[in-house]
Amino acid sequence: QILPGDSNPGETESIIELTREQIKLEESAAKSKIIETQREQEKFKIGVIDIPSFYRDYRALKSGDEEFTSTTSDVRRLLSNLEKDEIDALVIDLRNNGGGHLTEATALTGLFIDNGPVVQLRNANGRISRLDDPDPVPRSAYNGPLLVLVNRYSASASEIFAAAIQDYERGI
């Protein structure tokens, strides 16, 4: 029920019904492809992973499903497939990625750095908390050349990921 701010006492409230749609994670899921290129006489395979948003299936996670869908688990699987195809370099495409789950940005960063802090957060009281790479194994999932693409529509979690990769001098 709503009552406009400029209404008079005793006016009837309006009822507005909202229906929340189920978001299909498949539409936002990370996807990969390989671009083959040649420079002089040498051929190269460039793996490209497009990440439209940072997502996590909290319903599956809460129910105890260890195979829950998330940006990090999907990218880990895509990386494994790209490495089987013997890519020479990797591009993470975050253009037009408006962000999403911060925990996924920190976890995804952990696939490319050995360990360490990813971002610091300051709350309204000025208290600072640090989010580290959550992976307890100090080893990255991919060690080759890395490029992260962003544009003016990349925001929030995508900016945090891109900045961490740059701060750790892990990619450009």
How should each PLM-predicted stretch be described?
Residues 1-172:
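Cleft-lining beta-strand/loop regions that shape enzyme active-site pockets
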